[in-house]
Amino acid sequence: MGRHASLVLNAQGDPQIAYYDAGQGDLKHAAWTGSAWLVQTVDSAGNVGSYLSQAADAQGASRIAYYDAGQGDLKYAAWTGSGWHIQTVDATGNIGVHASLALDELGRPRIAYTNAGSDELRYAWWTAVGWEIQVVRSGKNTAASSSLALDENGRARISFYDPAWRHLRLASIEPFGVYLPFLMGDPN
């Protein structure tokens, strides 16, 4: 219990921890109420909840991106105030490991993640009509361990490890496409 944990603070500064319960194969969420921990099962549809990333919206409600190993999908869960709303973001193969979640200025989710089979790096974002998905870096063994941040203009910056070359890379998602300006080689 407690693998792949991700911590955020709600609007009152209380901790909320999303984690993968390996014994049950479930995604769980623990929220401090001020006097006790409230633990909920977010998703229990098979082996779900590993490689997760959590963010809190402006009201402090949890949003979680995670891998569904049973189906091989990237999923997204949002606390609605009364329950968890779950969506499948990407179901195009064994996809969704190393998820990194950020929320834009309007609270819309953005997720960087990789394909478990090929280490292809992808970026997904929510629009008014659904999820949009962009391939950031393709090819066998090209990306792992992604981390996403949004700049002051809401543009995505994704750091990731390039296992083929043993390099740390930085991708910038620009209006014209993907820009890969930074490369730091392994000194060993």
Named regions from a protein language model:
Residues 176-188:
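Enriched but not universal
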